[in-house]
């Protein structure tokens, strides 16, 4: 059956987590994700976005939007993904949903062209950062036990309050650690952190305070802390403004709207001398395979999402004990299990 047009379908999937995921925003035992499929003839491309309450993301709302735009999307002929992205921009979609569609289209396009994403974009993938694994909010003793037992070598430690002694204990470990407080620190905490030389041992300190320039204006790039913007860095437009305050940024495909805008954002961030991390939500191999394709451009990677899920539904690029194994199959190399 040869079709002149694409077929768009979707489903909501519940991922059980291997263990409770505890961060400053709350505790989670599962995550729900919207999985998008774009099909032409025998080829299928896949994209994913996760339900995140602190970003006010409702997958049911997304389903309503998809029902409304289904026929417009299906009418598109196969054009270059950057042109498809320009079409998506006209639909005025939430960034999470635009990202799932953009990634699904890149995956489909590569499969139709019989070329991997890395080849389509002439990406040299000889140098890959190693991914961190997330250590949930817990007592510092339990966090240290988990770190010491792990086969991974890089760790992102989540915390929901500031404790000087905890920080000293963590830094006594001979491990590569980053600290992510998901906005739970105060200005005073940040002053202590950026003026304390021992803090330079952290690879980075992510989103120390709640987002907004009232908070981040007290952060300085020329002190000991390598501050990294997450919620403060949603799009290209803020990169210049964040420059005096954040040395590093966390780029997540769902935040910026997909692979297409992420590549543009990475290019501009590099010109502005930012250190760049490719990040993820708690997502399956579908979302992780898309993020991993941009790891060659980045200084840091936080792509452990699929490693936290008990019932992954796809195969593609893999993160094994932090090492990124990029799929060399066509598109993003995603196949459903």
Identify the residue ranges that each predicted region occupies.
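Catalytic core of soluble alpha/beta enzymes
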Residues: 157, 162-295, 310-322
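Active-site cofactor/co-catalyst pockets and adjacent glycine-rich loops in catalytic enzymes
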Residues: 306
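Alpha-helix C-terminal capping segments
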Residues: 111-112, 293-297
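N-terminal capping/lid subdomain adjacent to the active-site entrance of alpha/beta enzymes
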Residues: 2-177, 182-191, 196, 315-337
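Short helix/strand-capping turn motifs
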Residues: 299-302
């Amino acid at each position: 059956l040869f079709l002149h047009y694409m077929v768009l379908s979707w489903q909501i999937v519940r991922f059980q987590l291997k263990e409770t995921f505890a961060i400053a925003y709350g505790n989670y035992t599962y995550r729900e994700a919207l999985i998008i499929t774009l099909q032409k003839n025998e080829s299928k491309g896949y994209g994913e976005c996760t339900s995140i309450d602190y970003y006010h993301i409702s997958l049911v709302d997304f389903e309503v939007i998809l029902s409304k735009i289904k026929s417009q999307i299906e009418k598109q002929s196969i054009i270059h993904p950057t042109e498809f992205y320009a079409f998506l921009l006209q639909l005025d979609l939430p960034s999470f949903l635009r990202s799932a569609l953009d990634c699904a289209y890149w995956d489909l396009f590569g499969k139709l062209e019989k070329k991997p994403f890395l080849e389509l974009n002439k990406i040299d993938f000889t140098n890959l950062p190693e991914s961190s694994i997330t250590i949930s909010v817990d007592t510092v003793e339990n966090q240290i036990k988990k770190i010491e037992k792990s086969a991974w070598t890089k760790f992102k430690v989540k915390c929901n309050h500031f404790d000087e002694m905890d920080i000293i204990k963590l830094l006594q470990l001979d491990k590569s650690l980053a600290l992510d407080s998901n906005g739970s620190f105060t200005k005073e905490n940040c002053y202590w952190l950026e003026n304390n030389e021992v803090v330079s041992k952290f690879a980075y300190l992510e989103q120390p305070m709640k987002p907004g320039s009232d908070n981040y204006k007290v952060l300085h790039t020329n002190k000991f802390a390598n501050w990294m913007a997450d919620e403060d860095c949603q799009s290209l437009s803020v990169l210049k403004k964040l420059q005096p305050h954040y040395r590093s940024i966390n780029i997540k495909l769902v935040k910026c709207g997909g692979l297409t805008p992420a590549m543009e954002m990475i290019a501009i961030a590099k010109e502005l001398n930012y250190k760049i991390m490719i990040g993820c939500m708690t997502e399956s191999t579908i979302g992780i395979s898309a993020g991993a394709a941009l790891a060659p451009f980045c200084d840091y990677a936080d792509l452990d999402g699929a490693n936290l899920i008990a019932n992954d539904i796809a195969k593609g690029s893999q993160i094994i004990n932090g090492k990124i194994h990029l799929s060399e199959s066509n598109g993003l190399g995603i196949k459903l299990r």
